Protein backbone atom coordinates (compact mmCIF):
# COMPACT_ATOMS: atom_id res chain seq x y z
CA UNK A 1 0.00 0.00 0.00
CA UNK A 2 2.85 2.34 0.80
CA UNK A 3 4.41 1.73 -2.63
CA UNK A 4 1.05 2.51 -4.27
CA UNK A 5 0.79 5.73 -2.26
CA UNK A 6 4.40 6.67 -3.05
CA UNK A 7 3.63 6.21 -6.76
CA UNK A 8 0.66 8.58 -6.46
CA UNK A 9 -1.88 5.84 -7.12
CA UNK A 10 -3.85 5.95 -3.88
CA UNK A 11 -7.55 5.93 -4.64
CA UNK A 12 -7.10 4.68 -8.20
CA UNK A 13 -9.43 1.69 -8.64
CA UNK A 14 -7.73 -1.68 -9.11
CA UNK A 15 -8.23 -3.46 -12.38
CA UNK A 16 -8.68 -7.19 -12.24
CA UNK A 17 -7.80 -9.67 -14.95
CA UNK A 18 -10.76 -11.64 -16.24
CA UNK A 19 -9.25 -15.12 -16.87
CA UNK A 20 -12.03 -16.13 -19.29
CA UNK A 21 -10.91 -13.40 -21.70
CA UNK A 22 -7.39 -14.78 -22.16
CA UNK A 23 -5.91 -17.88 -23.77
CA UNK A 24 -2.42 -17.12 -22.51
CA UNK A 25 0.27 -14.49 -22.25
CA UNK A 26 3.28 -13.72 -24.41
CA UNK A 27 6.67 -12.85 -23.07
CA UNK A 28 9.46 -11.61 -25.29
CA UNK A 29 12.69 -13.22 -24.19
CA UNK A 30 16.35 -12.86 -25.02
CA UNK A 31 17.82 -16.32 -25.61
CA UNK A 32 20.05 -17.40 -22.73
CA UNK A 33 21.53 -20.37 -24.58
CA UNK A 34 23.00 -20.61 -28.05
CA UNK A 35 20.43 -22.69 -29.92
CA UNK A 36 18.87 -19.96 -32.08
CA UNK A 37 22.17 -18.25 -32.78
CA UNK A 38 23.96 -21.49 -33.64
CA UNK A 39 21.18 -22.35 -36.13
CA UNK A 40 21.09 -18.78 -37.54
CA UNK A 41 17.44 -18.41 -36.49
CA UNK A 42 15.69 -15.17 -35.53
CA UNK A 43 12.57 -16.51 -33.81
CA UNK A 44 12.15 -19.49 -31.52
CA UNK A 45 8.66 -20.59 -30.48
CA UNK A 46 8.77 -21.95 -26.94
CA UNK A 47 7.13 -25.37 -26.66
CA UNK A 48 7.64 -25.91 -22.95
CA UNK A 49 9.30 -24.70 -19.79
CA UNK A 50 11.50 -27.41 -18.33
CA UNK A 51 11.16 -28.78 -14.84
CA UNK A 52 14.11 -28.35 -12.47
CA UNK A 53 14.85 -31.29 -10.18
CA UNK A 54 17.60 -30.78 -7.61
CA UNK A 55 19.23 -33.03 -5.02
CA UNK A 56 21.67 -32.64 -2.16
CA UNK A 57 24.01 -35.62 -2.06
CA UNK A 58 26.21 -36.09 1.00
CA UNK A 59 29.21 -38.36 1.51
CA UNK A 60 30.32 -39.14 5.07
CA UNK A 61 33.86 -40.41 5.55
CA UNK A 62 36.52 -40.03 8.24
CA UNK A 63 38.44 -36.80 8.63
CA UNK A 64 42.13 -37.49 9.18
CA UNK A 65 45.65 -36.16 8.64
CA UNK A 66 46.58 -36.21 4.94
CA UNK A 67 50.28 -36.77 5.59
CA UNK A 68 50.11 -39.81 7.84
CA UNK A 69 46.93 -41.71 6.92
CA UNK A 70 47.75 -44.53 4.54
CA UNK A 71 45.83 -44.60 1.26
CA UNK A 72 44.60 -48.13 1.93
CA UNK A 73 42.65 -47.13 5.04
CA UNK A 74 41.33 -43.71 4.05
CA UNK A 75 37.64 -42.92 4.01
CA UNK A 76 37.94 -39.78 1.91
CA UNK A 77 34.55 -38.17 1.34
CA UNK A 78 36.03 -35.94 -1.37
CA UNK A 79 37.18 -38.94 -3.39
CA UNK A 80 33.74 -40.55 -2.98
CA UNK A 81 32.11 -37.37 -4.30
CA UNK A 82 34.50 -37.22 -7.27
CA UNK A 83 33.71 -40.84 -8.16
CA UNK A 84 29.99 -40.12 -7.94
CA UNK A 85 30.33 -37.14 -10.29
CA UNK A 86 32.20 -39.33 -12.77
CA UNK A 87 29.43 -41.95 -12.63
CA UNK A 88 26.80 -39.24 -13.27
CA UNK A 89 28.70 -38.22 -16.42
CA UNK A 90 28.87 -41.86 -17.54
CA UNK A 91 25.28 -42.87 -16.75
CA UNK A 92 23.12 -39.81 -17.45
CA UNK A 93 23.81 -39.85 -21.23
CA UNK A 94 22.40 -43.40 -21.27
CA UNK A 95 19.02 -42.35 -19.80
CA UNK A 96 18.61 -38.67 -20.66
CA UNK A 97 16.38 -37.09 -23.28
CA UNK A 98 17.36 -34.97 -26.24
CA UNK A 99 16.91 -31.75 -24.24
CA UNK A 100 18.16 -32.96 -20.84
CA UNK A 101 20.84 -30.93 -19.09
CA UNK A 102 22.50 -31.48 -15.72
CA UNK A 103 24.92 -29.61 -13.51
CA UNK A 104 26.85 -30.09 -10.30
CA UNK A 105 26.85 -26.40 -9.44
CA UNK A 106 27.91 -26.55 -5.82
CA UNK A 107 30.43 -28.68 -3.93
CA UNK A 108 31.64 -28.27 -0.37
CA UNK A 109 34.03 -30.32 1.73
CA UNK A 110 34.69 -30.33 5.43
CA UNK A 111 36.91 -29.20 6.91
CA UNK A 112 38.14 -27.69 3.65
CA UNK A 113 41.84 -27.68 4.51
CA UNK A 114 44.62 -28.89 2.17
CA UNK A 115 46.28 -31.13 4.78
CA UNK A 116 43.14 -32.81 6.10
CA UNK A 117 41.24 -35.66 4.46
CA UNK A 118 37.63 -34.52 4.02
CA UNK A 119 35.29 -36.23 6.46
CA UNK A 120 32.22 -34.87 4.73
CA UNK A 121 31.55 -33.80 1.16
CA UNK A 122 28.32 -32.37 -0.17
CA UNK A 123 27.16 -31.58 -3.67
CA UNK A 124 24.09 -30.13 -5.33
CA UNK A 125 23.06 -32.00 -8.49
CA UNK A 126 20.45 -30.41 -10.70
CA UNK A 127 18.89 -31.67 -13.92
CA UNK A 128 16.26 -30.25 -16.23
CA UNK A 129 13.91 -31.63 -18.87
CA UNK A 130 10.37 -31.12 -20.12
CA UNK A 131 9.43 -34.81 -20.16
CA UNK A 132 8.25 -36.46 -16.91
CA UNK A 133 9.38 -39.96 -17.94
CA UNK A 134 12.88 -38.65 -18.60
CA UNK A 135 12.94 -36.82 -15.27
CA UNK A 136 11.89 -40.01 -13.49
CA UNK A 137 14.61 -42.02 -15.29
CA UNK A 138 17.24 -39.47 -14.25
CA UNK A 139 16.02 -39.57 -10.65
CA UNK A 140 16.07 -43.38 -10.66
CA UNK A 141 19.66 -43.17 -11.88
CA UNK A 142 20.56 -40.87 -8.97
CA UNK A 143 19.02 -43.42 -6.59
CA UNK A 144 20.98 -46.26 -8.27
CA UNK A 145 24.25 -44.32 -8.15
CA UNK A 146 23.82 -43.56 -4.44
CA UNK A 147 23.17 -47.27 -3.79
CA UNK A 148 26.19 -48.14 -5.92
CA UNK A 149 28.38 -45.69 -3.95
CA UNK A 150 27.20 -47.20 -0.66
CA UNK A 151 27.92 -50.73 -1.90
CA UNK A 152 31.41 -49.75 -3.07
CA UNK A 153 32.23 -47.89 0.16
CA UNK A 154 34.16 -46.91 2.14
CA UNK A 155 32.08 -43.75 2.65
CA UNK A 156 28.36 -43.55 3.32
CA UNK A 157 26.28 -41.69 0.72
CA UNK A 158 22.83 -40.17 1.23
CA UNK A 159 20.57 -37.97 -0.85
CA UNK A 160 17.58 -35.73 -0.46
CA UNK A 161 15.34 -33.90 -2.90
CA UNK A 162 15.60 -30.13 -2.57
CA UNK A 163 13.52 -29.07 -5.59
CA UNK A 164 11.14 -30.92 -7.87
CA UNK A 165 8.64 -29.11 -10.06
CA UNK A 166 6.66 -30.10 -13.13
CA UNK A 167 7.36 -29.10 -16.71
CA UNK A 168 4.93 -26.60 -18.23
CA UNK A 169 3.84 -27.40 -21.76
CA UNK A 170 2.85 -24.38 -23.83
CA UNK A 171 -0.55 -24.04 -25.49
CA UNK A 172 -0.52 -25.67 -28.95
CA UNK A 173 -2.80 -23.04 -30.55
CA UNK A 174 -0.50 -20.21 -29.47
CA UNK A 175 2.53 -22.15 -30.73
CA UNK A 176 0.82 -22.65 -34.10
CA UNK A 177 -0.11 -18.97 -34.39
CA UNK A 178 3.45 -17.89 -33.58
CA UNK A 179 4.83 -20.48 -36.00
CA UNK A 180 2.55 -19.13 -38.76
CA UNK A 181 3.67 -15.58 -37.99
CA UNK A 182 7.29 -16.70 -38.14
CA UNK A 183 6.70 -18.22 -41.58
CA UNK A 184 5.43 -14.84 -42.82
CA UNK A 185 7.86 -12.46 -41.08
CA UNK A 186 10.97 -14.64 -40.72
CA UNK A 187 10.72 -17.30 -43.45
CA UNK A 188 13.36 -19.97 -42.95
CA UNK A 189 14.59 -18.18 -39.82
CA UNK A 190 12.17 -19.48 -37.19
CA UNK A 191 11.60 -22.78 -35.41
CA UNK A 192 9.66 -24.41 -32.61
Model-derived segments and spans:
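Short amphipathic alpha-helices in soluble, non-transmembrane regions
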Residues: 137-147
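Midchain, well-structured core segments that form catalytic/ion-binding scaffolds
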Residues: 1-133, 163
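Residue-level detector of short coil/turn "hinge" positions at structural boundaries
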Residues: 11-14, 95, 156-157, 185, ...
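Charged catalytic carboxylate motif
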Residues: 80, 141, 173, 177
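An extended, acidic, His-containing surface patch that forms the Zn2+-binding/catalytic region
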Residues: 158-192
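Conserved helix-loop functional segments at active or binding sites
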Residues: 90-94, 148-151, 184-187
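Solvent-exposed, charged/polar functional surfaces in cytosolic regulatory/catalytic domains
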Residues: 87, 145-148, 177-184
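Conserved short beta-strand edge segments in small beta-sheet-based binding/regulatory domains
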Residues: 149-161
